[in-house]
Amino acid sequence: MNSLRRFVTATDAVRFQSPWTLEEWLCRADVVDNKQLLLVRANMEPHRSHPFHKHPTREELIYIISGQGEQWVGKEHRILKAGEMAFIPQGEVHGTYNPFDEKLVFLAILAPSDAPEPGIVDMSKEEPWASLRKDFPAVT
C-alpha cells in the first residue's frame, strides 16, 4: 500500500479475472490509503453475468460506463445504459447480466471498505433467485 498515493493511473490498478468480469481495482487499501470506499471497474464480456449475490455488510452503487446491462436489485430489474446507475442497499440481493452482443463496462463503488466478512454471499442457487434468470448461461 502506498499511503501517499492520491492519484491512480491505469497501470496502478490491481487487475483480477473473476468468474464474472475482468476487475480493475482502483480504490482499495493496497492501492490507496482509503478508509471508506472501494472502487472497481468491471469489464463484462457479452452474454456473461455476475449472478445473484449480496453484500451483507456493504452498500453498492453500479454506474454504467459503456454498453448496457440488465441490473437486478431485489426482484426488480432495469436495462441500464451509459451514464445510468443503480443503488443496492446493504444486504440486498442483486445481479448484473449482460445478455447483449457488446461488452459492458461499469464501476462498482462499495462502502465501507473495512466491513467484516463475508464480503459477498452467492444467492444464485437459492429460490427465488435461481428461477428468475434460469435461462441465462451459468458462469463457468
Model-assigned labels for residue ranges:
Residues 1-36, 122-140:
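A short, N-terminal "cap"/entry segment at the start of jelly-roll beta-barrel domains
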Residues 23-27, 40-55:
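Conserved short histidine dyad/triad with adjacent acidic residue
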Residues 41-42, 87, 101-118:
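A short hydrophobic beta-strand segment most commonly corresponding to one strand
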Residues 42, 68, 76-78:
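Well-ordered beta-strand scaffold positions
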Residues 51-52, 71-72, 88, 94-100:
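Short beta-strand His + acidic residue motifs that chelate non-heme Fe in jelly-roll/DSBH
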Residues 57, 76, 92-93, 102:
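A generic "binding-loop/recognition-motif" signal
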Residues 57-59, 63-69:
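Glycine- and acidic-residue-biased ligand/ion/polar-headgroup-sensing regions
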Residues 75-90:
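Short acidic-glycine-tyrosine-enriched beta hairpin
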